[in-house]
Amino acid sequence: ESRGLGDVYKRQTLTLAIIITLPMLQSCLDDNDHQSRSLVISTINQISEDSKEFYFTLDNGKTMFPSNSQAWGGEKFENGQRAFVIFNELEQPVNGYDYNIQVRDITKVLTKEIVTMDDEENTEEKIGDDKINATYMWISKDKKYLTIEFQYYGTHSEDKKHFLNLVINNKEADSAAENEDNTDDEYINLEFRHNSERDSPDHLGEGYVSFKLDKIEEQIEGKKGLNIRVRTLYDGIKTVSYTHLTLPTKLEV
């Protein structure tokens, strides 16, 4: 399913203002101030297919049980949806979970599958190759998600949707294979692609996107990391060699 940045930009603007203080909010949960709020990025997991109950898995593998999940009964969360969660930690433990929390806010993060570029549905023209910066990225401990913090230019109006994709480009892979000097079997080659849909580059904006890694799950095992091609805002095409297939410390609870 294609989703544009316009769908999430309005909520993300508020979230990003909070994320500026992310290291301070997430440094630790203060035992002396149980009303202090923390912010984390997590994965929403349904407890069962027939239930609206859910829990959160943090990128360090720990789990959080939302004691007030009924308050979010009217919200539709897909299993595996990524989200920013603002919460208070509660003292009473819940069996089977690392944390018992009271949820204050949930902001969905754009969550997508990796796509393979082809000559039919996912063409070069449709996927696009407009400028974008990948300012920060990390892989969850279970290696199920790659999350990218990015910057791009646009009007940031709701009727101007941009599209993001993490792409397997077999044409480039075949070309690289012809030249042994450009082939590195220890890395998986991917491309972070942006289609601005000809939006006017009026203002610099930021956002977050998470990509599911199930399509390359088997290939990741035994690899050093990922080579991610990005057409940057100011420096042309760059390839980021990402070797830290673990969670950054600033996002640990």
Positions of the model-derived regions?
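Sec-dependent N-terminal signal peptides
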Residues: L14-T21
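Bacterial signal peptide processing site
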Residues: L29-D31
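Generic structural signal for beta-strand residues in well-ordered domains
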Residues: E1-S2, T21, Q219-E221, E252
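Single conserved hydrophobic/aromatic residue that forms the stacking wall/gate
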Residues: E1-Y9, H244-V253
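C-terminal motif of bacterial Sec signal peptides marking the signal peptidase cleavage site
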Residues: M24-S27
